Amino acid sequence: MFIAINNTCHEQSTFSTYTSSGLVKNNLKESGFDYIKTKGFSKKRHMLSGNAVSKIKRNSLNKKVAVIGTGITGCTLSYMLAKKGIEVDLFEQSESICSGASSHELLVTYPRLSAHDSPFGRFNLQSYIYATNFYDNLETAAWKKTGVILLNHDESTQKRQSSLLEKRSDGEIYQYLNSDEASKISGIELKFNGLLYKDAGYILPNDLCRSLIDSPKINLFTSAEVKNISTMQDVTSFSVDEKIYEYEDVCLCTGSDTSKLLKIEGFNIKRGQVTHIETQDSILNINLPICAKGYISPQVNDLHIVGSSYSNEDHTKLTEEEHLSNLKNLKLIFDGDMVINSGKAGLRAVAKDHMPI
């Protein structure tokens, strides 16, 4: 462990310890650390402090990284790198950002949790908490922390929600709503009970991504289709319009296009189409996303987003079949007449077990 720590250090790395035991001192010395024994913290008599004996120079301030793709992943990664003082060259194959699966009018953010203590359940819970805190701290109007209601609409959902409520009843992550409570909170009459995820909501991806990459550390290249990625020793190169770019680190945030750039095992594409319906008096007051077999959003620019299909098709043309499927699923939430205005389709990158990539 001490060797692994030393391998991550540079010439200015320092450390301190709680303990000053012989075991720790011997391991520090053998693993390439210099130390001194000093007064301990609080009531502790002694502690150790020192530095790593390393010739590795700190170079992150002069580092430049290439990020390919300007969806939520690419823009968020660019933002995080820029916050660390790292310059980013951000490449987008289209004329404007968010041209792929992140191009939808809005994206609903909530977790798929498990009552069982599984890696999948823990990952989803921690991802959800991290994401909502991240969006909160951005203080951006592109994040709408409205809450999200998941309706208890069939036997499978009933079993899952009952298990979740048995596992956790403190209301911190989710809370039970009867149909009257769900109707009052959502702004529309609902016939099912369900769970409210109070810290969930939805994002406006285009606005969010523009705010994330608004930094002097981020250089945006649009209409820049990346080709011919190759790595030799510590340098990765690729071409854009026959010009060669070279970097120590290249990050592919390219979603369903990734398989065009690299050979990846177990990489699948799943199509998703959303339907934009015109608002009307009966749904005008919906003020948070409501999910059942499908979902409906609050109105954005006089439209509600209804989704989403999940098919094996590999194109992004709108189909009447998937529009009708979305509207059929919506009937569990709202069973009135709807007028289709438009829609949008994108391609998801998923593993064979449907986990997102």
Regions found by a protein language model. Give the residues of each.
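C-terminal substrate-binding/active-site "lid" region of AdoMet-derived donor-dependent transferases
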Residues: 2-49
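Glycine-rich FAD pyrophosphate-binding loop
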Residues: 83-103
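Central helical "cap/lid" subdomain
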Residues: 98, 244-290, 316-320, 335-338
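Dinucleotide-binding Rossmann-like beta1-alpha1 core, especially the glycine-rich loop
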Residues: 106-185
